Swiss-Prot record:
Pfam families in UniProt: Mito_carr
Record lineage: Eukaryota, Fungi, Dikarya, Ascomycota, Saccharomycotina
Residues passing through the membrane, by range: 19-36, 75-91, 109-128, 163-187, 203-219, 270-287
Gene that encodes it: TPC1
Organism: Vanderwaltozyma polyspora (strain ATCC 22028 / DSM 70294 / BCRC 21397 / CBS 2163 / NBRC 10782 / NRRL Y-8283 / UCD 57-17)
Keyword Acetylation: no
Localization (cell): Mitochondrion inner membrane
Name of the protein described by the UniProt record: Mitochondrial thiamine pyrophosphate carrier 1
């Protein structure tokens, strides 16, 4: 029996129900992958191996350090998830009035627009999450971002030292990354569901997550560097001395310099965890969203 698909071309879904379902789906996904996300970020921005990173984190910061920046990350995922699916539902219907293209292309276009909107709206919390999760000092709950107080302190610190622009370092690269990734995710997801109708949402979501993540991982690495390199606490976030030296504003120029000084492999540091994270993240996101939409509509 074919499952109902609320993301299919022309599917009429109410924006409010999509916002609510997307927010809950985003939070559910975040709760499942928070420790993997922390480890992935540290591998991406550091120079140590996974075993050494995990061992050092637990020994010097405690097991709960795997959830550093979790509050900022949870808020980010709620905003991102609600905007993502709300925008997709609206765009999905609106595109039908503008152009009539094959379902896969339709979903890819809607996904690209969705990616830009959701990335821009949630970006300040993405910056906060990255900085909090990669800070390696042994600190209290209040300063690791697992509480409202710690999150507020970091917001205040960034605003005072870097201004409003501090919350948007790397936003252009992020929008390019997320736009391509989201377009690939929705395009692949709908392509799989159209070609193999019996495929369930979780399986299609997992496959689309792996493909989209692999394509865009180098952009994600560049974005993470842009997010932390202007911080006054950079030395506590990474042991990679090149990050503080590579201060080019252009993502392309920065990419060239990274490859020249550190090699192509650096752009893919942490991709194993990134892919491992993307499978449950995308699968849970789409599965929870689809099932909540069935309940709410």
């Amino acid at each position: 029996m074919r499952e109902e698909d609320h993301l299919r071309k022309g599917e009429k879904s109410h924006v409010f129900e999509s916002l609510v379902s997307g927010a809950i789906a985003g939070l559910a996904a975040r709760s499942a992958i928070a420790p993997l996300d922390t480890l992935k970020l540290r591998l991406q921005l550091g120079t140590d191996t996974l075993p050494h990173t995990l061992k050092s984190l637990i020994r010097h910061e405690g097991l709960l350090a795997l959830w550093k920046g979790n509050l900022a990350g949870s808020i980010m995922y709620i905003i991102y998830g609600s905007v993502q699916f709300g925008t997709y539902s609206y765009t999905n219907a609106a595109l039908l009035k503008v152009c009539d293209v094959p379902p896969t292309i339709h979903s890819t276009l809607a996904g690209a627009i969705t990616g830009m909107a959701s990335s821009l709206c949630s970006y300040p919390f993405d910056v906060l999450r990255t900085r909090l999760a990669t800070t390696t000092t042994t600190t209290t709950t209040a300063t690791t971002g697992r509480s409202g107080r710690g999150l507020y302190q970091h917001i205040e610190r960034i605003y005072i030292r870097e201004g409003l622009g501090g919350f948007f370092h790397g936003v252009a690269t992020s929008m390019a990354n997320v736009t391509v990734s989201t377009a690939a995710m929705f395009g692949t997801y709908e392509g799989i569901r159209a070609r193999w109708p019996e495929t369930n949402a979780g399986t299609a979501g997992a496959i689309s997550g792996v493909i989209s993540r692999t394509i865009t991982f180098p952009l994600d690495t560049i974005r993470r560097r842009l997010q932390i390199r202007t911080s006054s606490e950079l030395g506590q976030m990474t042991n990679n001395g090149y990050i503080g030296k590579h201060m080019q504003r252009s993502a392309i120029t920065l990419c060239v310099q990274i490859v020249r000084d550190e090699g192509v492999k650096v752009l893919f540091r942490g991709i194993g965890l990134g892919l491992l994270k993307s499978v449950p993240n995308t699968a849970i996101n789409l599965w929870v969203y689809e099932n909540l939409m069935r309940v709410l509509t």
